[in-house]
């Protein structure tokens, strides 16, 4: 059974960028990986949207009242047992992330047009728990975004392509 989780895909409307984080190297799960702010849906959350907003505020200081939720993408099942719902939101105005040291090593912004252009994605493979797995990757500068986060970005790119 998959555990419910959610991430906030924050589009900085004024700068046309997407907020990403580099997870702390001290974390048990996915240390040092690039990810959206997010985490498990807690009993007190208002579903996936509430969890994504709460986690973004905890991890990078993005106030819940400073974003406009646009909707969600289809949930993604991860090899680590989570059903992750990407929550898409606009943030208006300036925002200076304040990474929570225990969870986030760094917060940064990637150009929206880079992570929503299918031409920037590639499919790679690596062995995980004895099984060869294929996954999306979308590198940008010094950042290597892969796996579930890249798959969610690719899902957003594909959704936008259908809107054209």
Segments predicted by a language model, with ranges:
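Short, well-ordered strand-loop elements centered on a beta-strand within folded domains, enriched
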Residues: 15-22, 97-99, 146-147
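Unchanged
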Residues: 40-141, 145, 154-164
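Buried hydrophobic packing segments
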Residues: 10, 149-156
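N-terminal strand-loop-strand
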Residues: 1-36
């Amino acid at each position: 059974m998959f555990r419910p989780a959610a991430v906030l895909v924050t589009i900085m409307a004024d700068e046309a960028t997407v907020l990403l984080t580099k997870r702390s190297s001290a974390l048990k799960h996915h240390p040092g990986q690039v990810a959206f702010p997010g985490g498990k849906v807690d009993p007190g959350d208002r579903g996936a949207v509430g969890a994504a907003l709460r986690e973004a505020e905890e991890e990078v200081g993005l106030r819940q009242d400073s974003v406009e939720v646009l909707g969600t993408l289809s949930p993604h099942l991860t090899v680590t047992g989570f059903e992750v719902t990407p929550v898409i939101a606009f943030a208006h105005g300036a925002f200076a992330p304040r990474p929570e040291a225990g969870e986030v090593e760094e917060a940064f912004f990637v150009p929206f047009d880079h992570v929503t252009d299918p031409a920037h994605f590639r499919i790679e493979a690596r062995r995980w728990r004895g099984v060869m797995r294929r996954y999306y990757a979308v590198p940008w500068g010094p950042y290597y975004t892969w796996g579930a986060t890249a798959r969610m970005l690719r899902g957003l790119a594909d959704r936008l392509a259908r809107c054209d």
